[in-house]
Every structure is written in C-alpha cells, then in structure tokens.
Amino acid sequence: MGYFITFEGIEGCGKTTQIKRAAQSLREAGHRVVVTREPGGCPIADDIRAILLDAGNSAMVPTTELLLYAAARAQHVAEVIAPALAEGAVVLCDRFTDSTLVYQGFGRNLDRDLIARLNTLAAGQIRPDLTILLDCPVAVGLARAAARINSRQTNREERFERESLLFHERVREGFLSLAGGEPHRFAVIDGNDGVEATATAVADVLLNRVPRR
C-alpha cells in the first residue's frame, strides 16, 4: 500500500508551489510519486471543477456546491487515488476531504456531520496518512491569490476569491480547528515564512513521516 499526503490551506497559502517541491524531493529519494488535485484530477472531475470554480456561477447554492464536490471526489478516488495507492505510490493531493469540511462546513455553515458522511461516501476507506496545513494570514493569502489571477492576464476570478474576508477567516479557523483535533495527522507549517523556509519545513516533515524506500 502507498502513502497518501494531502496539502490544505486557505486561498493563496502556497500549496501548489510546495507540492511541486515535495514531489521533487520524494522522487529524488526513490519514491514513485503521483501528484493530483481536488476538485479535479481526472476528466470527469475536471469538468465538475470548471463548474465549481467559475465566478459566473454565483447563483450556486451551498448544497449544490457540496454535492458537486462529493461527485468529483468519488470519481477522482476511484480513477486516480485508490489505484495509485494500491500500486505503492506516494500520492500528493492538493486539497481533499478536509477542504470540503472546512469550506462548506465552517465557511458555508452546512451541517458538518452530513459533510463527514458525504466525504465517507465519496472517499470510501481512503484517508490521508499525513496532512500538511500551510497556514498564513487571510490578508496575505488573498493578496497572493489576486496576484496569481493578475498574472494570468485575465479578468476571470474564481468563485471563492470573491467571498468575504469573514468567510476566509472562518475557513482559516476551521483548518486550525481540524488540525488541533488530529495532531497525529496534521503538520501545521507557517506558509508566511517564504518559499524556501516553507519548503525546508515541509521536507523535514516528509523525512520524518514518509516510510523510506
């Protein structure tokens, strides 16, 4: 069986950059690494992702959003994550069930027990062995996210970047609450410490937690 690592955090926390660095480090150590993301990771889930993140879909109600995430995850787990783990790979996933619990539960105030049941329905027995939470102040993360959008030279915003500051504060608090409840699974890393310092901290966690080849 492989090893499943998820990366979590607010918008603009630096997950994408750190996942790339982590994948390189693990491959150099001899691991077979699969990098994926949610929502998305396979064609059907990518189609759902486009609907979920499109800022034009502002009329989407929270329950619709939740069910779309669950549908995307069910396909992603069946098509990508479960097979890779069965083959012994280290799977790095940009967001997983914790994001749904935090964004739709803490952020949207949907029933968290219901979300947990849907997460179980979608993911089955797949659970992260390690979750790296990159934490940074909301203002910092949103500024980074805005810069990322500007760098694309497009006016297209993603739906979550249009949410209120209070929404994003609830999301951050939600992640920290989950981490506090499962300290054995979560490694909380300062995502406001610069790319290199953050990468070093992530590498230290991986060295201590991922089984060696």
From Swiss-Prot:
Signal peptide: none annotated. It comes from the Bacteria. Keywords: ATP-binding, Kinase, Nucleotide biosynthesis, Nucleotide-binding, Transferase. The keyword ATP-binding applies. ATP binds at residues 9-16. GO terms for cellular component: cytoplasm; cytosol. Its EC number is 2.7.4.9. The keyword Kinase applies. SUPFAM superfamilies: P-loop containing nucleoside triphosphate hydrolases. Belongs to the thymidylate kinase family. HAMAP family: Thymidylate_kinase. This is Thymidylate kinase. It comes from Geobacter sulfurreducens (strain ATCC 51573 / DSM 12127 / PCA). The lineage of its organism: Bacteria, Pseudomonadati, Thermodesulfobacteriota, Desulfuromonadia, Geobacterales. The gene is tmk.
